[in-house]
Regions:
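Flexible "arm" and connector segments at domain edges
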Residues: 1-63, 67-108
C-alpha cells in the first residue's frame, strides 16, 4: 500500500465507520497519546524496563496506531504525505549528504 492509498483508505474508513474526523486538536492529542504508547513498548523492549505481567510486545501495532492518526491529520489538513515525504528526503539529502560519513560514533 502506498502512502496515498493509505490516506485514501483511512478517509474511506472514517466516512463509513467513523462518522467524521475528530477535530485537528483532538487528533493531535490522540497522536501524542499513541506516540506515548509506542514509547512505552520501546522502553520495555529495547530499554531498561521490562514488560508487566499480561503486557504484550505489540511494537508493530503501536507504530500502526501512530501512522493511522498521522494519516487522519494529513487528510483533514489537506497535506499530501507522499509529496511532503519526497520534499523532506530531498532536504535531508542536501543538508546531511556528508554529515554522518565521518561520525566516529557511528562507526562500529
Amino acid at each position: 500500500m502506498t502512502i496515498k492509498e493509505a490516506q485514501e483508505a483511512v478517509d474511506r474508513w472514517i466516512k463509513e465507520y467513523g462518522v467524521r474526523y475528530f477535530s485537528e486538536l483532538t487528533n493531535m492529542a490522540v497522536l501524542t497519546e499513541e506516540v506515548g504508547e509506542l514509547a512505552r513498548v520501546m522502553a520495555r523492549k529495547y530499554g531498561d524496563q521490562s514488560f508487566k505481567e499480561g503486557e504484550k510486545d505489540n511494537l508493530g501495532e503501536e507504530m500502526a496506531d501512530v501512522l493511522w492518526v498521522l494519516l487522519c491529520l494529513a487528510n483533514q489538513t489537506g497535506v499530501d504525505l507522499t509529496e511532503e515525504l519526497k520534499k523532506s528526503m530531498e532536504k535531508k539529502t542536501q543538508r546531511d549528504a556528508l554529515r554522518h560519513i565521518h561520525n566516529k560514533k557511528l562507526m562500529a
